[in-house]
């Protein structure tokens, strides 16, 4: 999309979650529903879909990583502080800095998290989701369309993943395998945080994210992934 990078970026923020969420709903109704939402078969089926999508992307766009320009990217020096003779003093050690776009991504993640929490706690859709997750048979007895709820949840989850991909592409690069590392970390976060526990998942995500970033910078990204995977077995 021509013009300012912000135009294409804003369009992707809207189109990508809707498109991916819609495809996820279709996949749920045509594939996952047929295997009766069995956990093991669902994992195998969705991983198979992932490989198909990766190969289609490879054949369409090729193996080259493509940089994406962020809509804004001003650099900001990160200050530190100490208590000196004149009280609290700020200084800028080690040349640490970040960008306005990375700060915006952090803010967007917080906003999405708050939105998901509000939806789960204060909307009818969230009530249906929690009821279905707590007791599927009881939800069916009360007339809740469980399969439709499953499809909606799968679509929302896929849409949020697409939103995260749009936000992260300007920081990294667009590549047909760009989802591999986030997929591994998401499994680890969910297992450590606890299935169905939003606070536990958030806490696990913060811990894993910070440790992964620090270890990747000072040691190696591979070591960071190994240590994160080992945490699952503890």
Task: List where the protein language model places each region.
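Transmembrane alpha-helical segments in multi-pass inner-membrane proteins
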Residues: 9-18, 151-230
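Periplasmic/extracellular loop-to-transmembrane helix junction in inner-membrane transport proteins
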Residues: 1-9, 85-96, 171
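Hydrophobic core segments of alpha-helical transmembrane domains in multi-pass membrane transport
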Residues: 16-23, 49-57, 108-117, 158-161, ...
């Amino acid at each position: 999309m021509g013009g300012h990078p912000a135009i294409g970026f804003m369009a992707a923020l809207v189109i990508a979650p809707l498109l991916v969420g819609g495809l996820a709903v279709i996949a749920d109704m045509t594939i996952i529903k047929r295997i009766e939402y069995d956990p093991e078969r669902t994992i195998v089926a969705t991983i198979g879909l992932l490989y198909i999508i990766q190969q289609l992307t490879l054949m369409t766009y090729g193996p080259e990583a493509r940089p994406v320009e962020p809509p804004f990217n001003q650099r900001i020096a990160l200050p530190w502080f100490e208590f000196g003779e004149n009280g609290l003093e700020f200084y800028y050690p080690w040349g640490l800095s970040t960008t306005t776009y990375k700060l915006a991504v952090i803010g967007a993640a917080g906003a999405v998290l708050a939105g998901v929490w509000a939806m789960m706690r204060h909307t009818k859709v969230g009530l249906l989701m929690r009821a279905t997750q707590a007791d599927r048979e009881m939800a069916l007895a009360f007339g809740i369309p469980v399969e439709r709820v499953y499809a909606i949840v799968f679509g929302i989850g896929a849409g949020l993943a697409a939103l995260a991909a749009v936000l992260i592409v300007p920081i990294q690069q667009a590549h047909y395998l760009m989802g591999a590392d986030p997929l591994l970390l998401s499994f680890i976060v969910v297992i450590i945080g606890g299935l169905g526990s939003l606070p536990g998942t958030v806490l696990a995500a913060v811990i894993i994210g910070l440790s992964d970033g620090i270890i990747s910078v000072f040691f190696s990204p591979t070591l960071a992934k190994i240590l994160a995977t080992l945490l699952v077995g503890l």
